[in-house]
Amino acid sequence: MATDRRVSRVSSLIKREVSQMLLHGIKDDRVGAGMVSITDVDVSGDLQHAKIFVSIYGTEQAKAETMEGLKSSVGFVRRELGQRIRLRRTPEVVFLEDTSLERGDRTLHLLNQLQDARKEEDEYIEPAQDD
């Protein structure tokens, strides 16, 4: 079992290398359908599995195409990682769509709506109390 520090270091190395692959290495046109960024890499404690979370900006169709392209390029990504990073065994790679940014944006939007509604309610109540 690797230490937390080593897992963190391997995670950041994988994030950096896969980001470079997205820019220059992966030739699948589907990956370019949406703007892709890696938000997080979760490596298991034994360094055997890596979950790569990606955020995709674009239409729902572009997101679906991009995820298909990423899933089909898993073998290429794993092989490249094995060549670029010195590890005893290259981790199995899985791409997962990270929707936390969208959820956060939606939450902020709902909070802003709630705040605006309270302001309107306060403005409506205050003149009635002055009479």
Curated annotation (Swiss-Prot):
GO terms for biological process: maturation of SSU-rRNA. One of its GO terms (molecular function) is ribosomal small subunit binding. It comes from the Bacteria. GO terms for cellular component: cytosol. It is found in: Cytoplasm. Its main location: cytoplasm. Keywords: Cytoplasm, Ribosome biogenesis. Belongs to the RbfA family. NCBIfam families: rbfA. One of several proteins that assist in the late maturation steps of the functional core of the 30S ribosomal subunit. Associates with free 30S ribosomal subunits (but not with 30S subunits that are part of 70S ribosomes or polysomes). Required for efficient processing of 16S rRNA. May interact with the 5'-terminal helix region of 16S rRNA. HAMAP family: RbfA. Monomer. Binds 30S ribosomal subunits, but not 50S ribosomal subunits or 70S ribosomes. This is Ribosome-binding factor A. It comes from Gloeothece citriformis (strain PCC 7424) (Cyanothece sp. (strain PCC 7424)). The lineage of its organism: Bacteria, Bacillati, Cyanobacteriota, Cyanophyceae, Oscillatoriophycideae. The gene is rbfA.
